[in-house]
Regions:
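Short solvent-exposed loop/turn micro-motifs enriched in small/polar/acidic residues
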Residues: 2, 32-34, 69-70
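Intrinsically disordered, low-complexity acidic Ser/Thr-rich regulatory segments
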Residues: 1-30, 42, 82, 92
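Short, well-ordered strand-loop elements centered on a beta-strand within folded domains, enriched
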Residues: 1, 46-51
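Surface-exposed loop and edge beta-strand positions of immunoglobulin-like domains
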Residues: 30-32, 51
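C-terminal boundary/linker segments immediately following FHA domains
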Residues: 49, 54, 60-92
Length: 92
């Protein structure tokens, strides 16, 4: 994350985690360009992904907007004006 949250690590500790500014979000971020339920970050048993949940300002990975995108270490997720850098766990 950039700004106040820069360097903060947020583990995805469940299969489906909603990111948004609404009370029901698992990761609550009070940024005006983020929708109440903006996107979900999760794991489907095969890959980590981010999925837009019909947000107003969209969700992009590495500058490309798609409804759902598989994630890799080093990817940049953009939710409104917020940018997140992806670091995936090592597979042993």
């Amino acid at each position: 994350m950039q700004g106040f949250f820069e360097g903060l690590e947020l583990p995805v500790d469940r299969d489906w985690m909603v990111v948004g500014r609404g009370r029901g979000a698992d990761l609550l971020i009070t940024e005006p360009t983020i929708s109440r339920a903006h996107a979900a970050i999760g794991f489907d048993g095969e890959e980590f992904f981010v999925e837009d949940l019909g947000s107003t300002n969209g969700t992009a990975v590495n500058g490309k907007r798609k409804p759902r995108t598989a994630l890799n270490t080093g990817d940049e997720i953009q939710l409104g004006k917020l940018r997140l850098r992806v670091t995936l766990p090592s597979v042993r």
